[in-house]
Amino acid sequence: YVRVDLNHSDLIEIEDGVHIAGDCRLLCHKKELAEYKQGMTYGMMPYKYGKIHLCKNCAIGTGCIVMPGVTVGEGAVVGAGAMVTKDIPAWTLALGCPAKVVKEFPKDDPKYVSKKSQ
């Protein structure tokens, strides 16, 4: 299953060919911890909202969490268990928590071009 922020599903854009593996979460809201002050309760902290944009043919691995305000670029791959807190550029591999780009897949390099797409 994939958990989608249904209260704010209008903030989620998923283009054609996107793969989202099981146990992922797409969150369009989070508590704004930067606003935390001594004496505040968790319930007093404001929410921050942001759009999630999953571009054409990107892939989100099992158990990933995609946070608000993030774009995953065309053809990008996010490895299993990653927490995506910032944009992931097109044609890259991002891993970890928080997700960081560890590899690029140059579009003009034949090694990374599928024969099916030619």
Where are these regions (language model features)?
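Acidic/histidine-enriched, glycine/proline-rich intrinsically disordered or flexible terminal extensions
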Residues: 110-118
